[in-house]
């Protein structure tokens, strides 16, 4: 092995999945990858399954916490810093890559204190607290969306690392002429109950002759009741609690209705898919709206705020694009033009460049 690399990412799939893509690229180049995470994040399941050694530190977020938690915070942060220092001194990595989550704060500071080159990557159009704090001390600041960070010599717009099998060329789907449009509804692995309620009612108002074929990921707890909602309004739909093969789902779809998480937006561009985006209204710093605007500005998506979009409005917008397939084709072309197929390699290149000094 050429040396150790330490990846820091935790909490949600939006941080962990891009980090796993980078881990595979590091391994392909002959580096041993170790992972720094927290005991409560999704990394505890995904990282061991990927065959990577996982090192845990005790740290949690501060936003929205009560006074008691805020009083304890300095001690907790100091403890997590010493834990991260211990891991880095043990591994002696050639570089540390942080992709977000609470773990990256103490981990990034520990890298700096140990003189290990630090690279950070921000998946969203609005930088998270940890990445904003680490940007001044990082050797490279990678961003998925342009201008997330202030302009500097160390800023690099890379896109989001996305699994290679999600990239589809313009000829991967059957032409829209003479067939129904395929509509994919995604609410994340847990499902988005507002979408589960809105879509059946809206699709019932779409004229039958243009109504799309529907595949709806409703979440494990909501699949049964969502299927019943479709049956109640006499709309045929394939409702699933979870979709494990997203590459196949994207290849099937012609249009997606979904939230606007960073990874979802990047996957839409990789697959060349137009989207109606309903950002999570309570996301930190409203970052999902900013993510969605990236697609909307280019004509690849439409923004539908949850609070102001009812069934009639959604039905009208759906009917418009369903009656004009050329609109969907144009949106798909715009989405594909935004894809960054080299994102993973670019991030890893940046890490190894600073590692070499």
UniProtKB/Swiss-Prot annotation:
SUPFAM superfamilies, per database record: UDP-Glycosyltransferase/glycogen phosphorylase
InterPro entries reported in the protein's UniProt record: GlcNAc_MurG, Glyco_trans_28_C, GlycoTrans_28_N
Entry keyword annotation includes Cell inner membrane: yes
Biological pathway: Cell wall biogenesis; peptidoglycan biosynthesis
Pfam family, one: Glyco_tran_28_C
Record's keyword terms, sorted: Cell cycle, Cell division, Cell inner membrane, Cell membrane, Cell shape, Cell wall biogenesis/degradation, Glycosyltransferase, Membrane, Peptidoglycan synthesis, Transferase
Enzyme class: transferase
GO MF terms held by the record: UDP-N-acetyl-D-glucosamine:N-acetylmuramoyl-L-alanyl-D-glutamyl-meso-2,6-diaminopimelyl-D-alanyl-D-alanine-diphosphoundecaprenol 4-beta-N-acetylglucosaminlytransferase activity; undecaprenyldiphospho-muramoylpentapeptide beta-N-acetylglucosaminyltransferase activity
Membrane-protein topology: Peripheral membrane protein
Gene Ontology cellular component list: plasma membrane
Gene3D superfamilies reported for this sequence: Glycogen Phosphorylase B
EC numbers, comma separated: 2.4.1.227
Annotated residues for binding of UDP-N-acetyl-alpha-D-glucosamine: 12-14, 124, 163, 189, 243, 262-267, 288
Domain of life: Bacteria
Catalytic reaction equation(s): di-trans,octa-cis-undecaprenyl diphospho-N-acetyl-alpha-D-muramoyl-L-alanyl-D-glutamyl-meso-2,6-diaminopimeloyl-D-alanyl-D-alanine + UDP-N-acetyl-alpha-D-glucosamine = di-trans,octa-cis-undecaprenyl diphospho-[N-acetyl-alpha-D-glucosaminyl-(1->4)]-N-acetyl-alpha-D-muramoyl-L-alanyl-D-glutamyl-meso-2,6-diaminopimeloyl-D-alanyl-D-alanine + UDP + H(+)
Subcellular location: Cell inner membrane
BP-aspect Gene Ontology terms: carbohydrate metabolic process; cell division; cell wall organization; lipid glycosylation; peptidoglycan biosynthetic process; regulation of cell shape
HAMAP family: MurG (MF_00033)
Family (UniProt): Belongs to the glycosyltransferase 28 family. MurG subfamily.
Role of this protein: Cell wall formation. Catalyzes the transfer of a GlcNAc subunit on undecaprenyl-pyrophosphoryl-MurNAc-pentapeptide (lipid intermediate I) to form undecaprenyl-pyrophosphoryl-MurNAc-(pentapeptide)GlcNAc (lipid intermediate II).
UniProt-listed NCBIfam families: murG
Protein name: UDP-N-acetylglucosamine--N-acetylmuramyl-(pentapeptide) pyrophosphoryl-undecaprenol N-acetylglucosamine transferase
Species the sequence originates in: Pseudomonas aeruginosa (strain ATCC 15692 / DSM 22644 / CIP 104116 / JCM 14847 / LMG 12228 / 1C / PRS 101 / PAO1)
Gene name, Swiss-Prot/TrEMBL: murG
